[in-house]
């Protein structure tokens, strides 16, 4: 109907859709001209990324997080601080990677739980640090007392009493589900974490989209936004090579070209005669830019400055002519001219 806005259905959460959203966000952050301009666009993009991750998280963990948001009452009363420790069953499952399961790739799983429960979730205790050498160095120091305890998950929240209890209850339920190992090959959460890690590292490949669609380079887009670039010719089309100028001049001659002297015609005093121009002798009828040395200006070295004058006075410029002396020129003296030799 006229006047009604068409509402498009949201795309289903999938790894391919999440990869496209992350690529668009990376593109926006890589272009300096777009940073801070489209504020609402960046906010909507972040909200869509969080929605897709949440739905994928729910589907992969079989209802790990309730799809309904927390229903919190109005904040009444003072702010309280609550904390809870959930110990990890490392003795029952010594080879299971609970820390990686709780934190996720680059801490995304823990951040997802924090955003949905409103609690702070941290892994503490022995073997909670990736660098074992650094863990041994910090053991016994102030603020590192938790390294003497068994591996556990620390959940903290700050809110009014009623709201804090609701948040803590939800967080404890979700973390307890993470502490139950899944069978090998049936851990959907692990599959999702590996997929997210591949997307973040740029190694994830979409199997449903054709290769030309995936051939999208962020570096090329950033370079195109900063300045012009050369456009390559389409495959199969090669530009013809530029033809060279023929060596013979074309067009009406403007001035005569000096031909080389002939040694056979020499005057008695040794001066060679000039060869008369022939009909085909001419010059090039074209612009001087094709032959850069044809009409080159006289070099300054051909005008030596006389240094005998006073400093600051005008110097006399003397033109230097490079006349070629004939190698077989005969010098005729007065006595030889009289005798005829």
Swiss-Prot record:
Keyword RNA-binding tagged: yes
Keywords: Cytoplasm, Developmental protein, Differentiation, mRNA processing, mRNA splicing, mRNA transport, Nucleus, RNA-binding, SH3-binding, Translation regulation, Transport
InterPro entries, alphabetized: BBP-like, KH_1_KHDC4/BBP-like, KH_dom, KH_dom_type_1_sf, Quaking_NLS, STAR_dimer
Start and end residues of each KH domain: 87-153
GO cellular component: cytoplasm; nucleus
Family named by the database record: Belongs to the quaking family.
Name used for this protein in its record: Protein quaking-A
